[in-house]
């Protein structure tokens, strides 16, 4: 998910927002509001970070990470003989595919808006592109959150109820759950097309997302409540997905710690379980931190704007609301960052760190002892780690 930015003329992005710019919102502002936004030349914000390089960099890094994750998952999936071990790989692959497709559908729009140097209405006079952009952000944003929740539930069941998991968790069931998540989110995102909710151009008039406030004076009461319902439902569904993910991950960590303490007989096995438990706990906490940082600001900000009845309409005419709308823009950027971080926190970074850990221990052992058993222990650690993930 990327926010779109554009130019309302030849003026830089930040400057045109801070000066008496007659671009995106000017026709709808009052004379007083336009006067409040007028500043002397040279007083604009630093625009060094606003560039077409931003969406291009996000696209390239996201494409590389998700494509690499899909490649590794595909190779591992074909090698696995046990069907129940494929559930985790299916979830990882589906998550990477969801993030990758979401980027490919939104980022080209971002780049076109940048390079066209025009207002959104000039590029999309019918409003269909705005609807498509908002729908895409909603579908692939919520899908990523609920796929992460499904992975957390799968992991918790594999650790806390291994016998039930082995007999009931089949590959077909995993596929059905993932497909059901995607179809359910798509049905939800189509509600504005049916008249419940609305996708609108957001502040500063250069990207589209769910409207968080009531419509204008010409809209009916049912349409206004439809907007509030849809925006609130999106925020609460996102928070629900985060809650499920956090609860299941904490339950998994607790189960791993209990199992590690139970391994008191064999010292080597106990030490190995201790390392695996620590590594897995760190990864799960990293996942929770990434999800919190990337998604909590957007979801909480949406609820705050709904409660305060703040929307893009207020940003057009009330200068005191622009700070809140700018925070909302930053929150969307954080959510878009999650698509880049997902493959790393779930798969790529863990494999890199585990192999580096084994290499360091192997070289350290060469200095301390001539034993050659450590490489086997490292291979065993990776094997046990893969087993825990599945």
Curated annotation (Swiss-Prot):
Glycans are attached at residues 18, 36. It comes from the Eukaryota. GO terms for molecular function: prostaglandin E receptor activity. Detected in kidney. Expressed in small intestine, heart, pancreas, gastric fundic mucosa, mammary artery and pulmonary vessels. The chain crosses the membrane at residues 54-78, 92-112, 132-153, 176-197, 228-253, 284-307, 328-349. Keywords: Cell membrane, G-protein coupled receptor, Glycoprotein, Lipoprotein, Membrane, Palmitate, Receptor, Transducer, Transmembrane, Transmembrane helix. It is found in: Cell membrane. The keyword Nucleotide-binding does not apply. It holds the Pfam family 7tm_1. Residues 1-53, 113-131, 198-227, 308-327 are extracellular. Receptor for prostaglandin E2 (PGE2). The activity of this receptor can couple to both the inhibition of adenylate cyclase mediated by G(i) proteins, and to an elevation of intracellular calcium. Required for normal development of fever in response to pyrinogens, including IL1B, prostaglandin E2 and bacterial lipopolysaccharide (LPS). Required for normal potentiation of platelet aggregation by prostaglandin E2, and thus plays a role in the regulation of blood coagulation. Interacts (via C-terminus) with MKLN1. This is Prostaglandin E2 receptor EP3 subtype. It comes from Homo sapiens.
